[in-house]
Amino acid sequence: MDLAEYKSRYGGRDDAAPGWDAIDSRVREVYPGQEPKHWGTVIKHVIGGPDPIDGISAYSCTDGGIDHLHFITYGYTSLYYDEEAAGGDYSRFGFEMTFRLASKLPPLEEPMWVCNLLQNIARYVFKTGKWFEPYHWIPANGPVRADHGTDIVGLAFLTDPTLAPIDSPHGRVEFIQAFGITQSELDSFRDTKQTAEAIVEHHRKTNPLLVTDLSRKNG
């Protein structure tokens, strides 16, 4: 899309969010007719808000053999009207983050800790300028959910199994999923005994959508 077409289609609208709309369009293909649970910030990051991610949506999913919530961020990419971003190769960082949490449907509690986790990952990316690609990994420096006592203490990253990349008006957007890993798996990465790719693909055999289960034990 060239700048003239961009201005013609989106210009003059105070609420224009072509990047956000493009993400919504892709997600609706996967979850047609479903109204997600959504958490938004009070002040958008672009105008000085403290949280880098402006919104997080969660969809109920029963695919892959595990009931779960599928979280999707809005904030790593250019979401709002921006003539300088129009027609780019990649939209800002070029990805949005996703996360799948094993959960009863509907969930018994508000999973706000997931929103905090995703915001903390984004703070790292925005502060350092370093982004994640499939089969990268990071330690969480403790349980991913502090009040749970879970053995999940790190994250590996992969291409989201169901959300295909999109070409938004601001450039390409990929969907990178975080998957919870245990201390022994982190240790195997550090000792180069196994790669993150090997661990992810091992779990994919029995957990095709790579749903994070907080009850999964170390070992």
What are these regions (language model features)?
Residues 1-93, 97-219:
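Acidic, proline/glycine-rich low-complexity IDRs
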